Amino acid sequence: MKTSVYKSAQKKEHFRAVYNSFLHAMPFQTCTLETPYGETFLLEAGEPSNPVVLLLHGSCTNSAFWFNDIMALMGSYHVFAADIPGEAGNSSEFRLNLESADYADWLLCVLDALGLPRVSLAGNSLGGWMALKFATAHPARVEKLMLFASGGLAPIRADFLERAQAAEAAEESLSFDEDVAGGEHLPQEILDFINLILESYDPISVPLPVFSPGMLRKLTMPVLYVAGEADDL
């Protein structure tokens, strides 16, 4: 039996109501696709005649966190931002198997449903891992690959994982200002939304599989990697 990532049906309902209130204020189109891996929710912006870029968010976030990036890109690109299944968004509430080809197969289904033979992919943290998973499996479908503090290139730092697991056990949350945003102050509205996410669902609590050098050699497209000096991931 599949297990929802949400802590209760009530928490899921409340979280999604708040999330959708944010989305309604954004000048983007939305769509929901049916796939063999459940529903996939996407934001869409920009002219269909423009080059396509698909954005994949990190853990404990969703497509709304790409707002500023979509606003900057939509004048030159046809932008899609997908809520990853098993994360805190409007897509399927069931997490896929990280050790299998499930997430690569899911994204292939999404691109096929959208009629997109080839796209540029951009991923942050967990989303970077998803982008790598797809790009190593289907390099011919990826025009360019952009990774921001991506998982999957090295083991996650043990001290960060220990703090996250301790916070989860104590039903607390990490300080996003200090532990995730590198000390940069985040607006209270965003912090409240992040805390609502952490109160509503169970994030991935195991290290992401690391891609071997042999797998990374399958990347035939141009790759941009951006990371912070003190990045925990």
Language-model region placement:
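Conserved HGGG/HGGXW glycine-rich cap/lid loop of the alpha/beta-hydrolase fold
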Residues: 38-89
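Catalytic nucleophile serine of serine hydrolases
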Residues: 83, 125, 149
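Flexible "cap/lid" loop of the alpha/beta hydrolase fold
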Residues: 129-137, 142-173
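Conserved alpha/beta-hydrolase "nucleophile elbow" surrounding the catalytic nucleophile
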Residues: 57-59, 119, 123-128, 228
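Short beta-strand/loop motif that positions the catalytic acidic residue
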Residues: 219, 225-227, 231
